[in-house]
Amino acid sequence: MFNILSRVCRSSSFHGFLRSSGYPRFGASFRGISMLNDLNNSANYQSKKRVGRGPASGLGKTSGRGHKGSGQRRGRRIKPGFEGGQTPITKLFPKVGHSTGHLKKPLRLGLGRVQEWIDRGRLDASKTITMKDLLDSRCCRGIKHGVELTADEPGLLKTAISIEVSKATVQAIQQIKNAGGSITTVYFSPLALRAHLHPSSFRTPPRPPLPVSKKDIRYYTNPHFAGYLANVKNIRELYYGDQRFPYEPIVKDK
């Protein structure tokens, strides 16, 4: 209905009728007639709370704050969790459960994507594939805490590859071995990983680190996870021997 009235008001015949009937012309064009501007819904508006204006309002004198205390003072801010001095609920009960959000998790990479990159010729399966090769070929991006190989659907990996990553699932290791390949999981510290991915940033490469935590030592010495320390006979000698960090320094030409 409002649309019909607005069209009538904007029509030229309606303007001619106004001129012929003697009604004053208020402009070259007329705005559409609408009752929406006259609607009033007082429930959607809350009146301003006026305090300190006498006892009749109920908010005079202390303005609804009461007598003395932190609530009466200026700035009256109470820290979240404060319960007036009694033991807060955050301290009443022991901590339950745990969270793994703070752990440094490696980047997960599926074997299907590795096979796809080999089929495209972006990865060379004739040599050992390292995490630097995966980064340079854009097979995976943003390597911050290493790479973990995961198993996709069985049968996706058809090429025998030799790959070296930080971690791998048992299913991924089994699929690589079924395809006739080999895999080695190697421990990298943050410094060693940065030197491995970006060797041009180092004048002399850092010493290859050894796992320190008990969890990492158990992982990389376990042949079930293809750890690179699984074939080491004397782990203690590896950690405390004189040949702990054998490496050849690279000196750039001046």
Swiss-Prot record:
Chief place where the protein resides: mitochondrion
BP term (GO), one: mitochondrial translation
Amino acid composition bias (Basic residues), ranges on this chain: 64-79
Cell compartment(s), UniProt: Mitochondrion
SUPFAM superfamilies (UniProt xref): Ribosomal proteins L15p and L18e
Region of interest (Disordered), ranges: 44-104
Keyword field: Mitochondrion, Ribonucleoprotein, Ribosomal protein, Transit peptide
Name of the protein in question: Large ribosomal subunit protein uL15m
Gene behind this protein: mrpl10
